[in-house]
């Protein structure tokens, strides 16, 4: 567990922290351990995601494309045409499609079959854009939405809109650092 969301508070867990009812726990694990995590949290029958759409072609999108299982189809929508060409060079996988366009354009999203997408991830450098894009995706029936929100002041507001998962690099990094410290103490 790299973070716990308890009401308005985000906790980077230590060795003594415990989950409470209504907590939202953020896990980080290797692919092979996902079934165990699902079993622990009672989501064994959770339907797998097959179609993913990412708005924004940053490093996180590239990393996601490289680590995604072959059974998943990924569409990355990027506004910058040069970046699209670079993404095509960086990602050479049959199950990944790079689309030049604006991920906020609802006609483009419909054209790219957003209604058949199980997960939508907004990774632009703009928190407001990411939040609104996830809201729009939710309204189009996307089951799982993830918005990158770097402005800490926006996190609780975004969570109150029920847009799905909020990711923040600072919180994730803090969780990694703390986990490394714990690992070093156990050696």
Task: Please place each PLM-identified region on the residue numbering.
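Cytosolic regulatory regions of ion transport systems
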Residues: 1-187
